[in-house]
Amino acid sequence: KYAQAKKAPAVALYYQHNAPLEDLKVFDIVVVEPDHGYDPLALRAKGTELYAYTSVAEVQPTRAYFKNIPAQWQMARNGHWNSVVVDQTPAQWPAFFADQVVAPLWQRGYRGFFLDTMDSYRLASRFDEAAQQDGLVRVIETLHERFPGIQLIMNRGFEIAPRLKGKIHMVAAESLYRGWNAGASRYEEVPLADRQWLIAQLKTIQDRDGIPALAIDYVAPHDRALARETAKRIEADGFIPWVTDSRLSTVGVGTLELVPRRILVVYNSSESPALNYSNPHRYAQMPLNHMG
């Protein structure tokens, strides 16, 4: 079993602009939105790997490569996220995804990728499930052929995981205990039956395939206590936790919880001609340094 074989990495996901990389460097893996211009080499020397978020079976019109996707490959729409669902069955699709989505990011220095929307073909009114899954497998196999050493985190894709041994670094799933209802725009507790089903899927991935499992849950950003409690429940189940807000725009709680270390000190410049002789510096420097 994976959990017994090695220590699981600490993982964080942050999708908005201006990710606080200096704070997130305590995690082993940080998934970011690569279009926001991050340097993937920024934290590698410090032991933190930036993974690029990529959407496999959905694409938003704002993506640069959207205009190059043939109309006949567009099989449905996801109204909640204003995205188009991409058919995975065309023979040219794996090369398209490798060339136009992953290759530019690889050239920038990314070596890890978070593959999202693996089961979005189910949003279409008609689809051949086996053919769609075969297409997803071809995408991942093509990535390994084109980019030796690539590291992939797959969001769901439980059915194809046994066919991808050695090619998937981690399998993720959202909403184990707490989720975000995009249609109703609210945070919700996951129903027991759904939770039990998802736990069974993740445990199978870990025990049968030896792939670590990451559970991503969503809690209102002001409710830190609930986020902390949820992360502990996920970790107690044997999975890597990440609990954050619905927009993935805050530093959440995972295997690690970041402790704030920045203090704003206000002082009166008329007290002293030099900052190091001001009262806040004289009386606060030592205890603040002691606190880290």
Show which residues each predicted segment covers:
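C-terminal active-site rim and adjoining tail of enzyme catalytic domains
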Residues: 2-19, 174-176, 180-257, 280
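A short, well-structured beta->alpha microelement
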Residues: 7-22, 154, 285-292
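The substrate-binding groove and active-site-proximal loops of carbohydrate-active enzymes
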Residues: 26-32, 81-94, 126-130, 185-191, ...
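Conserved, mostly hydrophobic/aromatic
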Residues: 52, 115, 169
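Active-site-adjacent "subsite" loops/lids of carbohydrate-active enzymes
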Residues: 58-100
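Active-site groove signature of glycoside hydrolases
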Residues: 95-126
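Aromatic-lined carbohydrate-recognition surfaces of secreted/lumenal glycan-active proteins
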Residues: 136-162, 173, 210-220
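Aromatic-Pro/Gly-enriched surface loop or interdomain linker
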Residues: 253-292
